Amino acid sequence: MNCSKFFILCFSFLFSFAQAQNLALTKKKNLNTRIELGFDRGIQLSKNFPILKSGEQFNLSISKLYGSHFEAGIGVGYQNLGDEQFMPIYLLLVGKTKAGSGPYIESSVGYAYGENSKYEHAVISNFEGGKYFSTGIGYEFNIKNQYSFLASCNYIRQQSQVKHYEGETVNYIENLTFDLIVFKIGLLLK
């Protein structure tokens, strides 16, 4: 997972650099940077039985404001669910009811790379990430024209697979689904 943490760190520096370079042009380009921390709770569904999961996540995204009610962008995150760690890369869509402070809805779709500590050194099994989807509602508290505090509640559906090998061929694929409720807080840099 060190590679994933390194990628997130590099992505963070890229966003910070992009935000710093565009500080004077922010009004013209309407670029927003979101930094969010979340607490996850949910279940992992497999063919055997559901498993209760808890964890935390960190998301970093950059988006462009189109008008005063819609923004679209890209993001990356890190999600730790104990044995499983995911690194989603996603497209972010946000709809606002009004400019400034107020409620918003958000949706993310993408792919998450995954690792599982149980399968890290396994020879006959391999854990892989999969499709990532998130949707939720939140409230933006405008602090100044340059900053906002964010609070949201989201539903996340994360898919993954465990491939079991016999020799070099895949003998069995176990599809896993993680259904999570996430409470996030964050900072929006405008």
In which residue ranges do the predicted regions lie?
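Cleavable N-terminal export/targeting peptides
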Residues: 1-30
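Outer-membrane beta-barrel domain signature
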Residues: 24-26, 45-51, 80-84, 122-127, ...
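Transmembrane beta-strand segments of Gram-negative outer membrane beta-barrel proteins
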Residues: 25-43
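Gram-negative (and chloroplast) outer-membrane scaffold detector with strong preference
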Residues: 41, 56-149, 189-190
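Outer-membrane beta-barrel and related beta-rich outer-membrane complex signature
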Residues: 119, 163-165
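Outer-membrane beta-barrel porins/channels
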Residues: 148, 161-163
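Internal, hydrophobic beta-strand segments that form the core of beta-sheet-rich folds
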Residues: 153-154
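Outer-membrane beta-barrel "beta-signal"
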Residues: 175-190
